[in-house]
C-alpha cells in the first residue's frame, strides 16, 4: 500500500469452511492458521466488525436462537420462521437453499413502505462499542496483524431492507425515499467507521457490490449524484481523526467508470479487480500509482476450471503485470468456494509465495 516493492507480494484468502477443511487435509495440518503459514497468506477477516461494534435491537435477543450452517451468516442468531426460513435483527427474511449451502433473500421490512420512517431504523444511540476496543486493536497490531474496520456498503444495506428492484426504481421514481434512507444508513455506518478509526484501525471501508459485470448497477451518473457525496463525507470525517488511515471499498463487477471518482474521494484500496470484467494489468497501468489492487484471481475461470499449471501461470502473470512498485495484495477475487479444486488453490498461492521479486524493477526507488 506504500507503493514500494516489498520483500514478497502480500496474499490474502477468504474461503468457505469446506475449503479450509480441504486445505488442512491437503497439507496434513490441524489448523487453518498452519495452512496460511505454509502459503505465506493472511485470512481476509479474522474478526468481523459487527462482532466488536454491535447494534442493539430491542426484543430481538429474547426471540432469537443460534442457527448453524455452512452458508454465509451461519452460526449467528436469528428468529426462526420455519425449518428453512429465518429473520435477522434488521427484520430481513432469508431462506436456506435446497442444497443447504447458500441462502436467498426473501423480503425486507421496507418492501411495502412509502416512507423510510415507517421502519424503526437504529440510530447511533444503539451502537454498542467495546470500551476495550483500542486496547484490543493495539494487541492485534503487536501480533503483526493489519486491522480493518469494514461496514456494509450503504447501497447493499438499503436494497436488503427495501428489495433490490424496489430500491433501483426509487433512484428513478422516488429519489426522496433514497435520500432519506441513505441519510439514516450513512449516519450509522459513518459513526461505526469513526469509532474504528479512533480506536486505531489501519484501514476502514465499505463492503458490498455496487456493480454488475457490465456497469455500476444504479448507473454512474446516479451514483455520482446520490452516493458519491455521502461516501466522501464519511471518508473526510474519518481522515480528520487519522489522516493516514487507509480507505477500502469492496465491490464485485465492473466499477472502472467510477474509479476516478473513488480515487478523488480518497479510496486507495480497491477490492477486487475482478478479472472477468476489469483487466488488472490495464487498471494497474492507468491507476496503479494511486490505488492498491486488492485480490485479482479469477474465480469464474482459472481457479475453478483451470489446471494447476494454468493457476500458477495466472498468479505469476499478475505478479509481473501488477507487482511493480508495490500497490498489490493478491488473492482469489472473492470467497473461495467448494467448486475450486484444492490443488488449484495450492498451486495459485504457492506460485505467488515462491515468486522471486528480485527480478521485478522497483520504480519507487
Summary of predicted features, one role per range:
Residues 68-75, 128:
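Extended, Lys/Arg-enriched charged tracts that mediate electrostatic binding to polyanionic substrates
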Residues 105:
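Catalytic and substrate-binding clefts that recognize carbohydrates or anionic sugar/phosphate headgroups
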Residues 57, 89-90:
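Structural motif
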Residues 1-30, 34, 87, 93-96, ...:
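Active-site loop segments of alpha/beta catalytic cores
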Residues 22-70:
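Segments that shape or occlude catalytic/ligand-binding pockets
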Amino acid at each position: 500500500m506504500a507503493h514500494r516493492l516489498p520483500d514478497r507480494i502480500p496474499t490474502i484468502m477468504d474461503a468457505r469452511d469446506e475449503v479450509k477443511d480441504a486445505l488442512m487435509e491437503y497439507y496434513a495440518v490441524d489448523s487453518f492458521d498452519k495452512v496460511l503459514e505454509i502459503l505465506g497468506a493472511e485470512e481476509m477477516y479474522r474478526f468481523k466488525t459487527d462482532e466488536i461494534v454491535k447494534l442493539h435491537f430491542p426484543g430481538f435477543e429474547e426471540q432469537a436462537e443460534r442457527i448453524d450452517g455452512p452458508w454465509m451468516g451461519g452460526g449467528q442468531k436469528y428468529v426462526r420462521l420455519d425449518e428453512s426460513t429465518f429473520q435477522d435483527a434488521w427484520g430481513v427474511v432469508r431462506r436456506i437453499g435446497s442444497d443447504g449451502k447458500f441462502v436467498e433473500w426473501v423480503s425486507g421490512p421496507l418492501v411495502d413502505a412509502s416512507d423510510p420512517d415507517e421502519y424503526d431504523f437504529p440510530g447511533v444511540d444503539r451502537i454498542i462499542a467495546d470500551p476495550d476496543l483500542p486496547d484490543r486493536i493495539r494487541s492485534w497490531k503487536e501480533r503483526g496483524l493489519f486491522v480493518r474496520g469494514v461496514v456494509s456498503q450503504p447501497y447493499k444495506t438499503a436494497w436488503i431492507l427495501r428489495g433490490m428492484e424496489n430500491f433501483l426504481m426509487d433512484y428513478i421514481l422516488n429519489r426522496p425515499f433514497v435520500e432519506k434512507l441513505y441519510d439514516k444508513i450513512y449516519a450509522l455506518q459513518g459513526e461505526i467507521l469513526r469509532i474504528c478509526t479512533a480506536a486505531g484501525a489501519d484501514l476502514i471501508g465499505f463492503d458490498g457490490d455496487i456493480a454488475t459485470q457490465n456497469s455500476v448497477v444504479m448507473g454512474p451518473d446516479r451514483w455520482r449524484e446520490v452516493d458519491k457525496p455521502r461516501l466522501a463525507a464519511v471518508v473526510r470525517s474519518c481522515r480528520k481523526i487519522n489522516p493516514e488511515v487507509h480507505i477500502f471499498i469492496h465491490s464485485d463487477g465492473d466499477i472502472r467508470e467510477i474509479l476516478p471518482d473513488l480515487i478523488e474521494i480518497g479510496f486507495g484500496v480497491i477490492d477486487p479487480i475482478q478479472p472477468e470484467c476489469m483487466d488488472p494489468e490495464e487498471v494497474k497501468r492507468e491507476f496503479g500509482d494511486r490505488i492498491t489492487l486488492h485480490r485479482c484471481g479469477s474465480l469464474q475461470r482459472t481457479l475453478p476450471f483451470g489446471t494447476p499449471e494454468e493457476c500458477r501461470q495466472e498468479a505469476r502473470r499478475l505478479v509481473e503485470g501488477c507487482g511493480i512498485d508495490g500497490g498489490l495484495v493478491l488473492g482469489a477475487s472473492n470467497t473461495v468456494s467448494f467448486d475450486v479444486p484444492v490443488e488449484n488453490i495450492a498451486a495459485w498461492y504457492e506460485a505467488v509465495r515462491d515468486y522471486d521479486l528480485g527480478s521485478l524493477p522497483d520504480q519507487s526507488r
